[in-house]
């Protein structure tokens, strides 16, 4: 094989040119293969193809000549796509990232924290938790903007730390994203219960899974457009609820009640005793605040959702730095704005809220907004809000389907999952990874034998632990990445995003999340509240992740998996490919290897 290119004529799809230096495997029927200046040898052997400009990485398995020749007849060769496409614009990135964070927790589950801690504790706890999230976000932004590939922080764990941490982090993050799919499916079911419950919980499950699958197998640009509009709708919902709060607190309601900040004055800080024993105890206020802080650690997320889009973003080193900055500001505004508003519209001592929490009532009836609307005799608006909440939950589940499938795809690329999961369809969608991620939706069937609210609580505990572990991993990976970059910075391109206060910023995030992992299930240790099931849902992921790390490092690798030498870490292959893409997209600010 003496030349670099050949042309393949697809049946019904025109001609595509493949660059030998970039492309790896697809399965399709080829109408004809036409040599370009001797790319194919006379024997007719088929060589390796490495990328399709509009379709992602492909591979053609090499077949030696066995007396056959290539002619114009249609023949089938085993080829399959193994790379996603860069089709997402800045607006897609920002809205998809916001969509992955904002679900029903911000509008419904927040009522439990309000009831336990009071409005002031709720607002202060969320504001406080935004500090470590900011530290983690800027640390993530620095390494992801420098290395914008599929599953970047997981791939950097392999490259900069060791394989054992990468394996543990990959499986934990995939589990985190997958388990949130049934969480949102159950949330939709609980919201529907606001109107009626005389139906099988399997119906909304089936409908959502089919819709998630149909959306996920489309080209990523169509997924981006759909999620852009769904996320826009969620932002409109949040802003609409802010407007509702402002108007009604000034008397714009059927009761003409100018309630203002009455609920803040009534019980700004509320005592909470998990075991019900409040005799002679003054720790109730602290435990109320702690309950709000634990809720914040579940609800607030940040840069990891942007990072999962990095491998499919156009001009990533131009788009991602802006996205990280803008998304954090917008999410902080939405989180803190929601905490302020629920404390204004609903009292933590409201009888309906108290009954909803104590009786574990399913549905949006436990949403402080819906309770406030009913108290003010606003009849139609609760139904509208509930419809909007269903859309919000569906959109969040859609985003988790995307993130989980791309995570598993990245794991397969690194060899931590079977290679079959690297296969993509012609649109660059990792279809097998989508399928295995959606299998987790079946977990939502647990609600057939238990109260939906109970199942939601189980999932919340699992998600909280996994999310905190993921934050710890992000900080560890960043510290190792920073060490490698500073050792090699004279031979590497500039950082597109430079965070401040490092390494102390990352250390703050690391310590905060490590402490919260230990705290988040503390109530299970009260003598009256010990429950093996609750303990497992709170701390099982900690033991599983430790087991994966230790097992892989000392059993699978027999202790030979050592920390990477920062002087030997090679970023050049991935960065060269990113440079080539950005040059084709007329963005040349961070050129380095091409100039060299």
Curated annotation (Swiss-Prot):
A GO term from the CC aspect: endoplasmic reticulum
Task: List all topological domains (Extracellular).
Answer: 116-117, 187-199, 249-288, 348-379, 449-459, 527-534
Show the stretches that span the lipid bilayer: 95-115, 118-138, 166-186, 200-220, 228-248, 289-309, 327-347, 380-400, 428-448, 460-480, 506-526, 535-555
- PANTHER family attached here? AMINO ACID PERMEASE (PTHR43341), GENERAL AMINO ACID PERMEASE AGP2 (PTHR43341:SF15)
Q: Name one GO molecular function term.
A: amino acid transmembrane transporter activity
Bilayer topology: Multi-pass membrane protein
Q: Which Pfam families match?
A: AA_permease
The record places the following residue ranges in the Cytoplasmic compartment, namely: 1-94, 139-165, 221-227, 310-326, 401-427, 481-505, 556-596
So which domain of life are we looking at? Answer: Eukaryota
Provide the protein name. Answer: General amino acid permease AGP2
Decide whether keyword S-adenosyl-L-methionine is in the record: no
Which GO terms fall under biological process for this protein?
amino acid transmembrane transport; positive regulation of (R)-carnitine transmembrane transport; positive regulation of polyamine transmembrane transport
* Assigned keywords, A-Z: Amino-acid transport, Membrane, Transmembrane, Transmembrane helix, Transport
Q: Tell me the function of this protein.
A: General amino acid permease with broad substrate specificity. Can also transport carnitine.
Compartment annotation: Membrane
Q: Which InterPro entries match?
A: AA-permease/SLC12A_dom (IPR004841), Amino_acid_permease_CS (IPR004840), APC_YAT (IPR050524)
Q: What protein family is recorded?
A: Belongs to the amino acid-polyamine-organocation (APC) superfamily. YAT (TC 2.A.3.10) family.
């Amino acid at each position: 094989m003496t030349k670099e290119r050949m042309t393949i004529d697809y049946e019904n799809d025109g001609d595509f040119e493949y660059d030998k230096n970039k492309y790896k495997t697809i399965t399709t029927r080829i109408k004809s293969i036409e040599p370009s200046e001797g790319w194919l040898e006379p024997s007719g052997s088929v060589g390796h193809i490495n990328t399709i400009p509009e379709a992602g990485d492909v591979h053609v398995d090499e077949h030696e000549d066995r007396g056959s020749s290539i002619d114009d007849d249609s023949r089938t060769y085993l080829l399959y796509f193994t790379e996603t496409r860069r089709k997402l614009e800045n607006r897609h990135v920002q809205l998809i990232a916001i969509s992955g964070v904002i679900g029903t927790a911000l509008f419904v589950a927040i009522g439990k924290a309000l009831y336990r801690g009071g409005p002031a504790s709720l607002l202060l706890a969320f504001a406080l938790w935004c500090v470590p999230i900011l530290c983690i976000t800027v640390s993530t932004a620095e390494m992801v903007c420098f290395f914008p590939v599929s599953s970047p922080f997981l791939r950097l764990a392999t490259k900069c730390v060791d394989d054992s941490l990468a394996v543990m982090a990959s499986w934990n993050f995939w589990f985190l994203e997958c388990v949130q799919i049934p969480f949102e499916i159950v949330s939709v079911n609980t919201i529907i219960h606001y109107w009626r419950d005389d139906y099988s919980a399997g119906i909304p499950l089936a409908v959502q899974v089919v819709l998630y699958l149909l959306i996920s197998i489309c080209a990523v640009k169509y997924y981006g457009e759909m999620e852009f509009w769904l996320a826009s709708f969620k932002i409109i919902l949040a802003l609409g609820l802010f407007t509702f709060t402002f108007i009604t607190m000034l008397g714009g309601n059927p009761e003409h009640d100018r309630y203002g900040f009455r609920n803040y004055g009534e019980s700004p800080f509320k005592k909470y005793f998990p075991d019900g024993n409040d005799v002679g105890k003054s720790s109730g206020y602290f435990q109320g605040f702690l309950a709000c802080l634990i809720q914040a650690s579940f609800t607030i997320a940040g840069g990891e959702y942007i990072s999962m889009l990095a491998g499919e973003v156009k001009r990533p080193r131009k788009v991602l730095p802006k996205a990280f900055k803008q998304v954090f500001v917008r999410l902080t505004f939405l989180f803190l704005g929601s905490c302020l508003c629920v404390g204004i519209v609903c009292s933590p001592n409201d009888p309906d809220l108290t009954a909803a929490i104590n009786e574990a009532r399913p549905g949006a009836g436990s949403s402080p907004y819906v309770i406030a609307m009913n108290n003010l005799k606003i009849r139609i608006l609760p139904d509208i809000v509930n419809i909007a909440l269903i859309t919000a939950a569906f959109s969040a589940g859609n985003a988790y389907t995307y993130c989980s499938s791309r995570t598993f795809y990245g794991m397969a690329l690194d060899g931590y999952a079977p290679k079959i999961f690297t296969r993509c369809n012609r649109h660059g969608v990792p279809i097998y990874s989508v399928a295995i991620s959606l299998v987790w939706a079946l977990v939502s069937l647990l609600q057939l034998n238990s109260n939906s609210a109970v199942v939601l609580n189980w999932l919340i505990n699992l998600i909280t632990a996994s999310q905190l572990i993921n934050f710890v991993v992000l900080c560890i990976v960043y510290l190792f990445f920073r060490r490698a970059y500073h050792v090699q910075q004279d031979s590497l391109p500039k950082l597109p995003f430079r965070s401040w206060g490092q390494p102390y910023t990352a250390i703050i995030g690391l310590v905060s999340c490590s402490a919260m992992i230990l705290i988040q299930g503390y109530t299970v240790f009260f003598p009256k509240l010990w429950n093996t099931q609750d303990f497992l849902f709170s701390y099982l992921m900690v033991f599983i992740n430790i087991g994966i790390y230790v097992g892989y490092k000392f059993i699978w690798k027999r202790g030979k998996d050592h920390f990477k030498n920062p002087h030997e870490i090679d970023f050049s292959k991935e960065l060269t490919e990113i440079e080539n893409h950005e040059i084709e997209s007329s963005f040349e600010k961070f050129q380095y290897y091409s100039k060299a």
